[in-house]
Amino acid sequence: MHLRFIFEALSDLSTPGEYMRYYRQLRGLTTRQLAEKLNIVPATVLGYEQRRFPIPYDIAVLLAKELQIPESLLFDDFCIFISAPYTEILHTVRKRHGLNQGDFAESAGISPSIYAKWESGSRRPSRKMYQQLKAIYPEI
């Protein structure tokens, strides 16, 4: 009887989707089973694993809990920003540039009222808005 070890070495993994697939398989879960636990469709699980689209922050947090792994393995730069906490990062970068909220937001093409909600923590930036901010302020 021959057994084949199907799991790649952890050192070979580099993306959140690869970690997701590795630990899903390690836990003996099918894409359908994991999808049901996350309340999403199996095709979405495959999309995350195959890097067709990024894992949203809330899904990454839930997924880490389900797979019993550190959230950081499933976080891309946007998720790291959101968990940092992003309110402190935004405030610090804005102050470093010596700008008020309105000027900081307008220089990135963002509504000042929306930006104020981000910095106060009453609203979270979308991935698209994060990328827009990062294009102007790379240190974010």
Where are these regions (language model features)?
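Primarily N-terminal secretory
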Residues: 1-5, 13, 37, 56, ...
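A short, Lys/Arg-rich alpha-helix, primarily the initiator
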Residues: 2-26, 76-96
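Short basic helix-loop element that most often maps to the first helix and adjoining turn
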Residues: 18-37, 62, 88-103, 132
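Conserved hydrophobic/aromatic packing and binding residues within compact polymer-binding modules
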Residues: 20, 34-35, 45-48, 74, ...
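Recognition helix of helix-turn-helix/homeodomain-like DNA-binding domains
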Residues: 39-54, 79, 110-125
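DNA major-groove recognition helix of helix-turn-helix/homeodomain DNA-binding modules
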Residues: 58-73, 127-140
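Helix-turn-helix/homeodomain-like alpha-helical modules used for DNA recognition
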Residues: 84-131, 135
